[in-house]
Amino acid sequence: MADPKKLYIKTYGCQMNVYDSERMAEAMGGEGYVQTDRAEDADMILLNTCHIREKAAEKVYSELGRFKPLKAEKPDLKIGVAGCVAQAEGAEIMRRQPLVDLVVGPQAYHRLPELTARAATGAKALDTDFPEEDKFDHLAARPKAKRGPTAFLTVQEGCDKFCAFCVVPYTRGAEVSRPAARVLTEARDLVERGVREITLLGQNVNAYHGHARGLAGLIWDLAEIDGLERIRFTTSHPNDMDDALIAAHGACDKLMPYLHLPVQSGSDRILKAMNRKHTAESYIRLIERIRAARPDILLSGDFIVGFPGETDQDFADTMALVEAVGYGQAYSFKYSARPGTPAAEKEDVPGEVADARLQTLQALLTRQQRAIQDAKVGTTARVLFEKPGRLPGQMVGKSEHLHAVHVAAPDAARGDLVRVRIAESSANSLRGVLIAA
């Protein structure tokens, strides 16, 4: 019997890309491929790319360049580029890096097996269409092999908001939601394979409309699945946090008290320039309503500093918003222009100014995060163990609030959900002690 062909996938960027890479690996598994952790051993290399951060495309071209010696050594090696850089760059990738055999966008990866077959004939294979049919209808059933206790599940893709800085509407397309019945089927399958926590994914997940009662309705249906202990969702837009979803945070025990709700800026002038379609005040009022429903919720956010036209006062407004809200986790970045977006045509804030503002903002966010973590010492938490720790007999898992917790638990296993007392806080994690059952 011939040895199976080997597939190496390198994943960049968001959780949705992680999910997409899993599905691509499964699709290629049906073609006889098994995954390998070493590009040197692969018969096919696939880069699943992200286009959000600065110079994303150039980083992909640089990575491809490192495969030139390997391609020369193994002429039958197939190299593909998938994801959002593939969508944005298209055939330009093959022009700049002729070693690339196939390019596939995020809405067409269900066609990966046929593109691979085309590439095997020596032809270049390209598919960056936004197909009419739902790609999920054309993916093979997920394998029944056991897996870890947590999983991502994409329920929504694309975005209709057209923020001035963002490429997502151009690389992922318009908002599309998967029908609730199909999401529930996949969720039940994941639970049967050992999953106890599911994170629902979407570029704008709370705009989900595949259920008659929106994302809240889907969450309540998921909560009925025996064996599914925890539900999370990300990423959300403030304008789509409706009353039903806020109420679910207060009433659904399986919905974890954690919410990633990007705001990007605390300045109304900059929010308008970003085309965010909300104000700082409306965001703060929304946070108050969410906290009224779930007082212990941990909030996470995204911030961009140095957006074109940002003044010292605009930045001060952002700092004031952060002080008012109090974030347990946040992601902050210096603005970098994305080609093809409206903001790319505007004059940038000087780099040294943006750098200084970012440093100031991150210092505040770090203080807030550390204060919230320190306040957990002496409290109890339920921790879902995901993997062994670095120390003998240690397990690592996540609390309800998505904090990493290290626990001495020599008799525990992945997937155990245990009560612990938080004994110590460090910069990026907590240490817990098992509470006897």
From Swiss-Prot:
It is found in: Cytoplasm. The lineage of its organism: Bacteria, Pseudomonadati, Pseudomonadota, Alphaproteobacteria, Rhodobacterales. PROSITE patterns: MTTASE_N, MTTASE_RADICAL, RADICAL_SAM, TRAM. Belongs to the methylthiotransferase family. MiaB subfamily. Keywords: 4Fe-4S, Cytoplasm, Iron, Iron-sulfur, Metal-binding, S-adenosyl-L-methionine, Transferase, tRNA processing. Its EC number is 2.8.4.3. Monomer. Residues 145-371 form the Radical SAM core domain. InterPro entries: Elp3/MiaA/NifB-like_rSAM (IPR006638), Methylthiotransferase (IPR005839), Methylthiotransferase_CS (IPR020612), Methylthiotransferase_N (IPR013848), Methylthiotransferase_N_sf (IPR038135), MiaB_methiolase (IPR006463), rSAM (IPR007197), rSAM_horseshoe (IPR023404). GO terms for cellular component: cytosol. This is tRNA-2-methylthio-N(6)-dimethylallyladenosine synthase.
